[in-house]
């Protein structure tokens, strides 16, 4: 009986794959921007209103004031959206780390490549940091495993495509 195989598209051509790469490449910048934005809003409230943002919002809520359409509402929504995106990525990375068979290894690959607070200068520095977590790692192995880690993270973030699922079901049924 011949195996019925569908041609598989190159994973690097899938849009969710590129979305994940873009998301990871911008992760540090988004974290930085979010921290700066929150700090600026907090400082502005202390200067303008003489109280914390939490105290200000509580007094607005108690007074029944409506902040719709204000600059404050716009800033809050931007900060909230960035925070939710970071939480989504962090949650997906945590799930991958805890549940995937190579999760711990993939976590450290993604951490030193994209998620750590300080960007490392080059692949050699990343590999040096990875050595305690992944033995016998070479630059070639690093790139291969990093690609695998991004693919796994993509599947957690965006789900499997129907084509991916069909292949899994075929393998399971054989």
List the predicted regions and their residue ranges.
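Short amphipathic alpha helix immediately N-terminal
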Residues: 101-125
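DNA major-groove recognition helices of helix-turn-helix
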Residues: 142-160
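Alpha-helix capping at helix-to-loop junctions
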Residues: 98, 115, 119, 155-159
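Aromatic side chains
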Residues: 17, 27, 114, 142-143
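N-terminal interaction/assembly modules
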Residues: 1-101, 158-174
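Short, well-structured alpha-helical interface segments that form or flank functional binding sites
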Residues: 22-25, 84-91, 104-108, 137-144, ...
